[in-house]
């Protein structure tokens, strides 16, 4: 209950540190002190204090720039709205209408994984169809969200099939090998036909189906069943998606949806003012995880490599060093916003891997997946931009909103 309320607050009510910067700028404008002016941190504090004293003495403050937090990146046209600002602004644009659909699909994905854990055949099939329907609605409402939601759904199908409670189903599937061969032939035929017809995405999707079912032929009975569950549910979701989207696609028109290398990056101070809350929470979480894994052990014992667990600790340590060096290089070559996002994504993926090899808590795995995807989305606009965008305006706008949703939840 408390976790849900906190997630709701971070998602729908919380703001950014940029509001604090705006108030600081107001007081700095009326500051009359010149002591240590221009000094970092100390000078900023004295400027604020001087402005506060001037305000107490009756000097009026400049008007608050309420529009500023939605344009936090200086020197470009990036739109940096966050959900609370969007709700206050109240303009019924696709990004606002897409927010409940985005959160709905995340909730459905979690429900799907839990139903698979309990071996609920009917529930999992219905939820797979609802995932396809939600993605179709997202495409018709706010197309920017669809690639991310497709990735979330695929991750859910992977975890659902790998954790499915198969004991209750094994007795009802006595001819899995024949089913695998049937799916292989059907998928390969559709993939070949789509490739000849120039339907690249359809060919790629069914080629993946053919590859998956081909592997299942040579797998153990349990693994074959899990791979078939993945294929079945993914096809159910895809068919549901196509039933609703095909009529829509016949009446829509798009222009040059490719990606290109961006020429702009987020100023690091502006980036931190917007995302500082979430990075602070992420840092606290990572420190807690590291403390739990090293509880009761000295730093010296970590590098005592005569035991297997110590060797794993040494490997983990050097991997973290590599992540830091790669992030530092990205910061020097491209920008520190990309460096911090990439480092966060790498560390969270590392913790996700350790969790999957260890206790395999679905709750923690789900949270780590949301963190990893959120950091990856923040890194994306620092490298690529959608073609025909005005600089990075809408690319940052739409993907930062997605990142906020994922990190908050």
Regions found by a protein language model. Give the residues of each.
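Aromatic-rich transmembrane-lumenal/periplasmic boundary elements in polytopic membrane proteins
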Residues: 2-88, 259
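Specific aromatic-rich, kink-prone transmembrane helix
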Residues: 56, 60-73, 80-82, 98-117, ...
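Hydrophobic/aromatic-rich transmembrane helices and adjacent perimembrane loops
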Residues: 149, 393-409
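Juxtamembrane "helix-exit" motif on the non-cytosolic side of transmembrane helices
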Residues: 248-254, 330, 381-389
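Hydrophobic transmembrane alpha-helices of multi-pass, membrane-embedded glycosylation machinery
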Residues: 150-159, 207-216, 344-350, 409
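Membrane-interface alpha helices of multi-pass inner-membrane proteins
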Residues: 86-89, 128-141, 187-197, 326-329
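Membrane-interfacial loop-to-transmembrane alpha-helix junctions, especially the N-terminal start
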Residues: 3, 119-128, 175-184, 223-240, ...
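Membrane-interface transmembrane helices that cradle and orient dolichyl/undecaprenyl
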Residues: 105-125, 155-182, 210-219
């Amino acid at each position: 209950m408390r976790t849900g309320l906190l997630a709701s607050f971070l998602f729908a009510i919380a703001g950014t540190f940029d509001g604090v910067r705006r108030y600081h700028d107001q007081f700095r404008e009326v500051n009359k002190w010149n002591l240590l002016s221009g000094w970092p941190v100390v000078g900023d504090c004295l400027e604020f204090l001087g402005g506060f004293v001037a305000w107490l003495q009756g000097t009026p403050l400049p008007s608050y720039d309420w529009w500023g937090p939605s344009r936090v990146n200086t020197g470009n046209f990036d739109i940096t709205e966050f959900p609370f600002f969007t709700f206050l602004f109240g303009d019924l644009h696709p990004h606002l209408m897409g927010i409940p659909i985005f959160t709905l699909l995340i909730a459905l994905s979690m429900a799907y994984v839990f139903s698979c854990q309990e071996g609920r055949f009917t529930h999992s099939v219905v939820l797979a169809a609802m995932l396809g329907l939600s993605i179709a609605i997202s495409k018709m409402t706010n197309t920017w969200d669809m690639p991310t939601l497709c990735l979330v759904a695929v991750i859910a199908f992977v975890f659902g099939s790998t954790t499915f409670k198969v004991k209750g189903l094994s007795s009802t599937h006595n001819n899995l090998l024949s089913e695998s061969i049937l799916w292989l032939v059907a998928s390969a035929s559709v993939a070949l036909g789509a490739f000849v017809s120039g339907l690249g995405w359809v060919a790629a999707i069914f080629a993946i189906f053919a590859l998956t079912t081909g592997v299942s032929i040579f797998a153990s009975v349990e693994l074959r069943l899990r791979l078939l569950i993945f294929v079945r549910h993914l096809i159910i979701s895809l068919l549901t998606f196509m039933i609703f989207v095909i009529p829509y696609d016949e009446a829509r028109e798009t222009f040059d949806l490719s990606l290109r290398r961006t020429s702009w990056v987020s100023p690091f101070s502006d980036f931190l003012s917007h995302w500082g809350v979430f990075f602070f929470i992420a840092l606290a979480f990572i420190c807690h995880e590291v403390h739990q894994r090293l509880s009761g052990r000295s730093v010296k014992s970590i590098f005592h490599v005569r035991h297997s667990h110590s060797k794993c600790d040494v490997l983990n340590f050097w991997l973290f060093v590599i992540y830091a060096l790669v992030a530092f290089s990205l910061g020097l070559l491209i920008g520190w916003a990309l460096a911090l996002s990439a480092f966060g994504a790498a560390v969270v993926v590392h913790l996700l891997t350790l969790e999957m090899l260890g206790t395999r808590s679905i709750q923690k795995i789900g949270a780590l997946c949301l963190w990893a995807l959120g950091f990856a989305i923040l890194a994306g606009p620092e490298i690529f931009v959608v073609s025909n965008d005005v600089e990075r305006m809408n690319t940052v706008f739409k993907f930062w909103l997605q990142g906020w949703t994922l990190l908050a939840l």
